[in-house]
C-alpha cells in the first residue's frame, strides 16, 4: 500500500501549560482540545487521558508529561502538560518538551503562588520567548477589583523576569466551565487561543541551520540498505543530499541520503523536529551506532571544553545524597551517548549541593560535535544526577 504524505499545511508550534499546582493546567489543556474539536479543527482529549501522564525518560531523568495535539484556524500545536512541579523543572531544563511559548495558568481565587514564580523564572532560564496568561476560575470570584489586582500581580511578576508584562495578553475565564460546554466560558478559551496564535511568534525554526541528526538506532532493511533513526535537531534532510557521519573522536564516514520516512509515511524531506528514519547509501549497519551524528558535510566541529548552566537533582528526585566538589568527574550524556568530563566550579564555590542551580566549566575526555545551547544530562554510574545546557564553547 502506498504511504500517504504527512500534512504540513499549517505552521507547527510546541507549547505547554505552566503554573502552580491545582490552578487548572490540565483542565485547561482538556478544555482547549474540546473547544477546538467543537470548532471543527481537531479531536478532543479527555481530562483523565491527559491527567494520567505516562512516565518518560529524557536524558535519563524520569519525567511525567502528557502530550496532546490540536489545531486552531491558523496553526497546529503540540501541547505538553506535566502533573508535578518537579516534572516541570526537569522537563524544562532537559528540553524534553521544547516550548516555543507557554500558557501560564493562574487561579483567580489564589493569585500568583510560589510555583507560578518558579515556572516563569525557569521559562526565562531555558529560553521560552513569550507567555500568554489564562486567569482561571474567575466564575468563583465575585469581586471585580480582586480580579484586577490578581492581573496586576501577574503582570508585575512577568515584568520582573523580563517578559513583556505590560503588553502580554491576559485572558480571564473558566477552564472547567468550557470543558462542561458552557458557551460563555468556551468563548474565553477561543479568545485564549486567538491570543496564543498572535502573541506567541512562530520561532525562527532550526530548519535554516545546517542539517544535524543524532543517531538513536540503526536497522538494516533487506533490499533497501541501512536506516538510521533519530530526531532531526537542525536543518533539513533531502533525498539525494550528501552527508557526513561523525563519531566520538573517531574518523568520519561520508554517504548520501536515499530516502526519508516519518510516521510510516514517505517524505520528500525531513526537517528540524521530525522523528525520522534516514536511508543511507553504501553504509553497513556495523559501521554506525547510537551516539554518532549525521550532519551536512563540514558544518559541525567537535569541542571538549565549555561553560554550562546546570541543575543538580535533589536526593528525592533520585540524585546524589551528598554534595560534590571541584574536579568532580561524572559522565555527560549528550544527545544519545555518555562521555566522561571534569567539572570546575566557579571561584568562591566550594561545593555543590543536591538541588542547586549554577554555572560550571566542563572539560570532556574526547571532543564531540557541539554547539551553544546543546543540552545534556550529568550521570554517575548510569544514574542521572543533573541536567544542563552549554552556554559557551571554550576551545
UniProtKB/Swiss-Prot annotation:
Transmembrane segments: none annotated. Residues 81-84 are annotated as: G3. Residues 174-176 are annotated as: G5. Residues 19-26 are annotated as: G1. It catalyses: GTP + H2O = GDP + phosphate + H(+). One of its GO terms (molecular function) is GTPase activity. InterPro entries: EF-Tu_GTP-bd, EF-Tu_GTPase, EFTu-like_2, EFTU_2, G_TR_CS, P-loop_NTPase, Small_GTP-bd, T_Tr_GTP-bd_dom. Residues 10-204 form the tr-type G domain. Residues 136-139 are annotated as: G4. GTP binds at residues 19-26, 81-85, 136-139. Residues 60-64 are annotated as: G2. Keywords: Cytoplasm, Elongation factor, GTP-binding, Hydrolase, Magnesium, Metal-binding, Nucleotide-binding, Protein biosynthesis. It is found in: Cytoplasm. Mg(2+) binds at residue 26. One of its GO terms (cellular component) is cytosol. Its EC number is 3.6.5.3. Belongs to the TRAFAC class translation factor GTPase superfamily. Classic translation factor GTPase family. EF-Tu/EF-1A subfamily. Monomer. HAMAP family: EF_Tu_B (MF_00118_B). GTP hydrolase that promotes the GTP-dependent binding of aminoacyl-tRNA to the A-site of ribosomes during protein biosynthesis. This is Elongation factor Tu. It comes from Christiangramia forsetii (strain DSM 17595 / CGMCC 1.15422 / KT0803). The gene is tuf.
